């Protein structure tokens, strides 16, 4: 087997290794286009938006527990060598970096305050990361216990003083706010006036209801029970809409649209939610109602109160209490039962009076009024629940029914008194007749 070995001086073309560069340079330039650049050269319009690539250090570097000082190099000799020395040739063919160095250094000196992360960055010759503002919410969640201790010394992190949107992140991520999620009032964070961490600690008191004036008229609704010849409209306030969306009813968009007499449309629910958001009320999509739908659900508070007032007037003036009392008295006209029946009527009158007095002390909110409480909170809360379910109709209606029942008891007692008088008069006449008979016989 023959092995041919050629040295550099025995090449067929007669050119040595030293003449290689001369031969390449002597080739005609027309046959070859210009060589592509070794790096990307941005256009002049994109120069301001271009940032050079970030190269991590060639070895893992632990956080340095020291500050910037004159003896930093002597105390830490491994920092004397440039960790990016091996990457220097790569930066040579990039002339645009020289033009960007001065503006970036000036911007860094202007925007970066001296703080915790600045000395290690300067000591290593690294460019500071620009996403500190995005990392601030994660940093603050880890400072739940030490936030008050760091409040007096502001940190030098860029964007930590007033990070944009931090209040909203805290309001969403704070686990202590889970109890307020079911509220229909749209929560608005209070803007912080100071840049310390103590103002960033969010609590329940820092969320206020964004609801507008509760007495403001939201819309006007025609009555359900009025005749066509005398149609009356009732004003629905913002406070009433809030009460219909809150417990115990918790109406959804469909039922609320029916109460407000809104015509059904394809985007009716979305339009209603957008309008409620403008006044500070939150109506989530897909919400389920909490209470059963009754005929009273379709009434607004103004019409329900109007119905209760008319019902009370009719019960007081038109209820046949006297006729009912006389009829029942004739059913129990046995003289042996009169005394026991009178005792039962007096006891029923006393019980009815006690219950009527209790209902008279009811201070359930009527409309936007908030009267002072008289009853105990446990009893008043139950009466308020009943009033909210009936939209103000239930309490006055029960009082009107109690008034009609009391009138019946009074008429029954009057009927018994007449029966007692007639019975006594009849007995006295019979005794006189018997005396006359005895005298006549004698």
Swiss-Prot record:
Domain of life: Eukaryota
Compartments (UniProt record): Nucleus
Gene Ontology biological process terms in this record: positive regulation of transcription by RNA polymerase II
InterPro entries: TF_AP2 (IPR004979), TF_AP2_C (IPR013854)
Disulfide bonds: none
Record-level Gene Ontology MF annotations: DNA binding; DNA-binding transcription activator activity, RNA polymerase II-specific; identical protein binding; RNA polymerase II cis-regulatory region sequence-specific DNA binding
Region (H-S-H (helix-span-helix), dimerization) location: 287-417
Positions carrying Phosphoserine: 246
Locus of motif PPxY motif: 54-59
Chief location: nucleus
Pfam families recorded: TF_AP-2
GO cellular component, one term: nucleus
The entry's keywords: Activator, DNA-binding, Nucleus, Phosphoprotein, Transcription, Transcription regulation
Tissue: Expressed most prominently in the mitral cell layer of the developing olfactory bulb and to a lesser extent in the granule cell layer. Also expressed in skin, articular cartilage, primary chondrocytes, and chondrosarcoma cell line SW1353.
Function, as annotated: Sequence-specific DNA-binding protein that interacts with inducible viral and cellular enhancer elements to regulate transcription of selected genes. AP-2 factors bind to the consensus sequence 5'-GCCNNNGGC-3' and activate genes involved in a large spectrum of important biological functions including proper eye, face, body wall, limb and neural tube development. They also suppress a number of genes including MCAM/MUC18, C/EBP alpha and MYC. AP-2-epsilon may play a role in the development of the CNS and in cartilage differentiation.
Similarity remark: Belongs to the AP-2 family.
Subunit structure as annotated in this protein's UniProt entry: Binds DNA as a dimer. Can form homodimers or heterodimers with other AP-2 family members.
UniProt protein name: Transcription factor AP-2-epsilon
Organism of origin: Mus musculus
UniProt lineage: Eukaryota, Metazoa, Chordata, Craniata, Vertebrata
The gene coding this protein: Tfap2e
């Amino acid at each position: 087997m023959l092995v041919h070995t050629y040295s550099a001086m025995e090449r067929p073309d007669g050119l040595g290794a030293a003449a290689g560069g001369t031969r390449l340079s002597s080739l005609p330039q027309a046959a070859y286009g210009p060589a592509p650049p070794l790096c990307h050269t941005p256009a002049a319009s994109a120069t301001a938006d271009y940032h050079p690539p970030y190269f991590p250090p060639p070895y893992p570097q632990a956080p340095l527990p020291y500050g910037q000082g004159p003896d930093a190099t002597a105390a830490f000799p491994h920092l004397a060598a440039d960790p990016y020395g091996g990457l220097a040739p790569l930066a040579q063919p990039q002339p645009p970096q020289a033009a960007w160095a001065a503006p970036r250094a000036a911007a860094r000196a202007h925007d970066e305050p001296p703080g915790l992360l600045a000395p290690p960055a300067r000591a290593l010759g690294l460019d500071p990361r620009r996403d500190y503002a995005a990392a601030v919410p994660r940093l603050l969640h880890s400072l739940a216990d030490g936030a008050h201790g760091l409040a007096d010394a502001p940190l030098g992190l860029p964007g930590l003083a007033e990070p944009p949107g931090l209040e909203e992140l805290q309001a969403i991520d704070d686990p202590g706010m889970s109890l307020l999620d079911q509220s229909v009032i749209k929560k608005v964070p209070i803007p912080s006036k100071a840049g310390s961490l103590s103002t960033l600690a969010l609590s329940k008191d820092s969320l206020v209801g964004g609801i507008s004036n509760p007495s403001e008229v939201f819309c006007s609704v025609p009555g359900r029970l009025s005749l066509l010849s005398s149609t009356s409209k009732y004003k629905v306030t913002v406070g009433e809409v809030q009460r219909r969306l809150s417990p115990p009813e918790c109406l959804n968009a469909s039922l609320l649209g029916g109460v407000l007499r809104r015509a059904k449309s394809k985007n009716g629910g979305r339009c209603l939610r957008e309008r409620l958001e403008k006044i500070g009320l939150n109506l989530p999509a897909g919400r389920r109602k909490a209470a059963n739908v009754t005929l009273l659900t379709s009434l607004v508070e103004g019409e329900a109160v109007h119905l209760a007032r008319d019902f009370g007037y009719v019960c007081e003036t038109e209820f046949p209490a006297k006729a009912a009392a006389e009829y029942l008295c004739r059913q129990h006209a046995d003289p042996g039962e009169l005394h026991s029946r009178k005792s039962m009527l007096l006891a029923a009158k006393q019980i009815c009076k006690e219950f009527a007095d209790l209902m008279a002390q009811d201070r359930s909110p009527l409309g936007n009024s908030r009267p002072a409480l008289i009853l105990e909170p446990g009893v008043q809360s139950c009466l308020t629940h009943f009033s909210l379910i009936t939209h103000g109709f239930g309490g006055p209606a029960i009082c009107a029914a109690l008034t009609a029942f009391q009138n019946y008891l009074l008429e029954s007692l009057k009927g018994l008194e007449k029966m007692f008088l007639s019975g006594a008069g009849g007995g006295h006449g019979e005794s006189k007749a018997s005396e006359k008979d005895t005298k006549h016989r004698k």
